């Protein structure tokens, strides 16, 4: 063994030790934060939405903005700005306060109250299968499970979600396998292992009927590809079960494909193409766009025999999507043959949830992010292979245990100041079964690196996505773009992206939902995500595939109701 090999091994061992110490400190701080003062940052980014100049938008959408009354529950408070293509969602959810006492003198009482409350709720959850739901008495109703006020009388308030009763029929056993849950809905997850052009093996999951009994099952469904965020898998689109976007759109008649980037839960590669350890982790978002996303799109289109698909992505997945659409000439320059204009020619509708195009103020405020930014290029600190590999070792040992999911949640809350206020509490532990995943240190350098010779997301997003330059030179070739921007998301700057579309992309067919009370992850896991995100998506996709004229959508859409199996299940519950 040469000197360089010994040095590299020593460096990797030291980096592992440093990361373990770092994670231990974060865990202690996260637990203290959770039990003493669990916090949710309700601020937005410092960027203001600028829509005052009426002359900036010189054309209207192909699909005029529509009201969502036909699909949404009555309490949604929506403000429509048709000229600028924005729906402002001002809806406020009535939430149960976890502590009724305030002040430092009641600290111990608060801790005891939290402990006792969680113990009682856990006992009630275990008994709920055998106990019926009784109106007029305290019960383990869906309102309690959804972290809302327990109901003593059935009074219609904001938190009365008609789909909440679906939670009562969910299996709360923790199993890190989507098939375990979806088989209970008569859906099978078909799994594909695909090899990218540069030799990495990635996962693609397909929702299909468990039992094919009718001719309608064989009808061609329009394909939807879903792509996950950083350190997640596409299980994040489905972990809500019957209240997930994946399930809802599947039951609404669409062909759902869950795409996963390299390296996932099980890193795998073609050793002939990727022979060395260094090459196995020598990739970042550019390779994920050029190889992973293109392979996922090509595979879905080949298997469904459609020319175009709908891409729905979250967080990092939106970065991949916009990188491909805006910079496709850099990935596949003119003369690239079949790859030329790859993304604009194969994506019909692009739906971005919590779009990560510009960095938010949280990246400059959080101490741990500042530390990572400073040391991310230092191989003695984070190594040069898998980022925080200790997380994956712990996951492989502990996934499926409620303690593991709880720890993941507390760290998540501590680092980003988001919490489960708007989630279905009973499903919280399930969400963390499908994360984290392996990512490379080089990918994290792409996100955070301060190196002036590199273009990173934190310091160079203006170069990748220039604010005042049109991204689509030929708007007729651009897909329909739908943005769901959470106002309480400080990890990214969604308001800056809104300003770009309103003030620069006037010829592109876009539509924006700006949701006051949502944070970065609520766009996937909020208790009312179907009403506020799923049904607007469904409405616009139905409009696209039915090819109805835009004038048909100037009313409140009362004549375009779609009854989905999800709603029928909710009525039975």
Swiss-Prot record:
<dbReference type="GO" id="GO:0016125">
    <property type="term" value="P:sterol metabolic process"/>
</dbReference>
<keyword id="KW-0551">Lipid droplet</keyword>
<dbReference type="InterPro" id="IPR029058">
    <property type="entry name" value="AB_hydrolase_fold"/>
</dbReference>
<feature type="active site" description="Nucleophile">
    <location>
        <position position="315"/>
    </location>
</feature>
<dbReference type="GO" id="GO:0005811">
    <property type="term" value="C:lipid droplet"/>
</dbReference>
<comment type="similarity">
    <text>Belongs to the AB hydrolase superfamily.</text>
</comment>
<comment type="function">
    <text>Mediates the hydrolysis of steryl esters, thereby playing a central role in lipid metabolism. Under heme-deficient conditions, it constitutes the major steryl ester hydrolase, suggesting that it plays a central role in mobilization of steryl esters under anaerobic conditions.</text>
</comment>
<dbReference type="GO" id="GO:0016042">
    <property type="term" value="P:lipid catabolic process"/>
</dbReference>
<keyword id="KW-0378">Hydrolase</keyword>
<keyword id="KW-0472">Membrane</keyword>
<dbReference type="GO" id="GO:0016020">
    <property type="term" value="C:membrane"/>
</dbReference>
<keyword id="KW-0443">Lipid metabolism</keyword>
<feature type="intramembrane region">
    <location>
        <begin position="13"/>
        <end position="33"/>
    </location>
</feature>
<feature type="active site" description="Charge relay system">
    <location>
        <position position="520"/>
    </location>
</feature>
<dbReference type="Pfam" id="PF04083">
    <property type="entry name" value="Abhydro_lipase"/>
</dbReference>
<feature type="topological domain" description="Cytoplasmic">
    <location>
        <begin position="1"/>
        <end position="12"/>
    </location>
</feature>
<feature type="topological domain" description="Cytoplasmic">
    <location>
        <begin position="34"/>
        <end position="573"/>
    </location>
</feature>
<feature type="active site" description="Charge relay system">
    <location>
        <position position="489"/>
    </location>
</feature>
<dbReference type="InterPro" id="IPR006693">
    <property type="entry name" value="AB_hydrolase_lipase"/>
</dbReference>
<dbReference type="GO" id="GO:0004771">
    <property type="term" value="F:sterol ester esterase activity"/>
</dbReference>
<keyword id="KW-0442">Lipid degradation</keyword>
<protein>
    <recommendedName>
        <fullName>Sterol esterase 1</fullName>
        <ecNumber>3.1.1.13</ecNumber>
    </recommendedName>
</protein>
